[in-house]
């Protein structure tokens, strides 16, 4: 993604994980074949489901060990745009995240013709860093200014003096407290559906589509304009 070969995790040969689409009233049955050399799990973010299907290892289920298969099975009792991701270690940060879409039933009293039946485009926004997730985690614990320096958002002593906040800067540094920022981590690339850009060439001017957007980022906030 950023010009360097790095370790990542693909599911069904892709990053992000495949979009999963259901309709309210369905029963989801998802087979997870773990071909990694480590344990894994999948968490269904924001879904109403039986606790044992929630996907938190060593809390609601045992970890899915390497070389084994686990089946998640739960009823779809809601509609909306959600996402799913690994809940094991830092696997989410290197590829294990994806879109989870639940469509409204056509006989639902709130079904909107011309909206709920539009062609759907799942979009997952995320980020990529060439640093290993463990190193990112370590640097955050060290409370260094490295990521702020990379983003160009550090405040110099001269700037603190001009703002009348020199004592505040000294005090915060003494407490190893980082300066406030929108996001703590610098990323080399921001991705849309696992790519630097995404073209929807199947549509033409005048077509209507429904974008189902999920933030699959580890620590980024996204502001979209249309």
Pin down the residues of each PLM region:
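Histidine-centered copper-binding motifs that mark active-site loops
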Residues: 1-226
């Amino acid at each position: 993604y950023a010009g360097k070969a790095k370790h990542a995790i693909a599911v069904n040969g892709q990053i992000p994980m495949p979009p999963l689409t259901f309709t309210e009233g369905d029963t989801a049955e998802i087979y997870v074949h773990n071909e990694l050399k480590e344990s894994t799990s999948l968490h269904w973010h924001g879904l109403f489901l039986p606790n044992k299907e929630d996907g938190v290892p060593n809390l609601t289920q045992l970890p899915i060990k390497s070389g084994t298969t686990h089946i998640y099975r739960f009823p779809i009792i809601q509609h909306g745009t959600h996402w799913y991701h690994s809940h094991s270690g830092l696997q989410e940060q290197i590829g294990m995240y994806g879109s989870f879409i639940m469509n409204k039933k056509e006989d639902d009293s709130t079904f909107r013709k011309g909206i709920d039946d539009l062609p759907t485009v799942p979009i997952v926004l995320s980020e990529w860093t060439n640093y290993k997730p463990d190193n990112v985690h370590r640097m955050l614990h060290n409370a260094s200014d490295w990521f702020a320096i990379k983003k160009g958002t550090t405040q110099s002593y001269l700037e603190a003096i001009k703002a009348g906040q020199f004592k505040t800067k000294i005090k915060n540094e003494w407490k190893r407290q980082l300066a406030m920022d929108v996001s703590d981590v610098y990323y080399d690339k921001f991705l849309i559906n696992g790519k630097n850009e995404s073209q929807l060439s199947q549509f033409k001017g005048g077509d209507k589509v429904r974008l189902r957007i999920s933030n699959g980022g580890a620590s980024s906030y996204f502001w979209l304009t249309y």
